[in-house]
Amino acid sequence: MTAFALSLILAAAVIHASWNYLLKRSGGGTVFVWLFAVSSTLIYAPLAAAIIWWQKPDFGWVHYGLMFASATLHTVYYLLLDRGYRSGDLSIVYPIARGSGPLITVLCAVLLLGEHPTALAVAGALLIGGGAIALTGDPRKLRQSGNLHAVGFALLTGCMIAGYTLVDKIAVAAWLIPPLVQDWATNLGRVVLMTPSALTRRDEIGPTWQRAKRSIVAIAVLCPLSYILVLTAMVFTPVSYVAPAREISILVAALMGTHLLAEGDAPRRLAAAAAMVGGIVCLALG
């Protein structure tokens, strides 16, 4: 992995953990997710239009199909992630979701894209899996405060991460969709898919905006930015390297969960997160 790709991924990781912290702190909800999707689409529309005007890409049905598939997977991802945060702690949900995603992604990259991880990469995958298990601690504790349900949502979120990562890799690397345009189209599709559900809760839209408009706008800026950086790295870097390396955000989220959100058992959680980061480093170097 080049230094430029690694710098993009590290910057994206910090930004990604930051907007997840804001989502957890805000309380979330379907209307909240819809509002920041709408805001993201509006904020990044001028940049997307400028890139399309400048590059004049020749989009066909395959390009639009990849955009729609990514939008669908991202929509399910955000809804599952939000449900997980409302069920359990940030420092449980975030690392398990982000830790399981790369494992599934690497497996699919081997089976579907013909990538071949080394022994060091396999060791990294095992560290990530072990760290995710250690993070949950005593299985009996998972039944407290909804954490068992939160782990389920986190694992489903990991499946969605693998799905949209592979789709977006194909979109930006094989079909040459500009990264910002791919992300913007995904956000637009998410707005379209979520609007019917949001309208059934129209009485919540105004109060949710008034209660959390600063968090909504911040997430609307940070969420696309973090993924645009990742998509840019994926243009010239194998996905089996990018997907695991970006999970350095796990450690950042664990720090936020234990220190900013006062979630307990900091030593165990941070040690488990550190093991997962070690696994990510092995995957990146392998």
Model regions and ranges:
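Helix-coil boundary and interhelical linker segments in multi-pass alpha-helical membrane proteins
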Residues: M1-L6, I43, A49-H63, T105-A121, ...
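Helix-loop junctions at the membrane-solvent interface of multi-pass transporters
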Residues: A49-W54, L111-L112, A134-D138, W175, ...
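C-terminal structured domain segments across diverse proteins
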Residues: I216, F236-A243, G257-G286
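Specific alpha-helical transmembrane segments that line the substrate/conduction pathway
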Residues: A69-H74, Y85-A132, V181-G189, V239-H259
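Membrane-interface interhelical linkers
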Residues: M1-A69, V76-G88, G137-L155, A185-V221, ...
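Hydrophobic transmembrane alpha-helices of multi-pass small-molecule transport proteins
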Residues: Y44, V106-V110, A119-P139, R268-L285
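Selected transmembrane alpha-helices and immediately adjacent juxtamembrane segments
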Residues: L148-V181
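Hydrophobic/small/kink-forming positions within alpha-helical transmembrane segments
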Residues: A13-A17, A45, A71-L79, G99-L107, ...
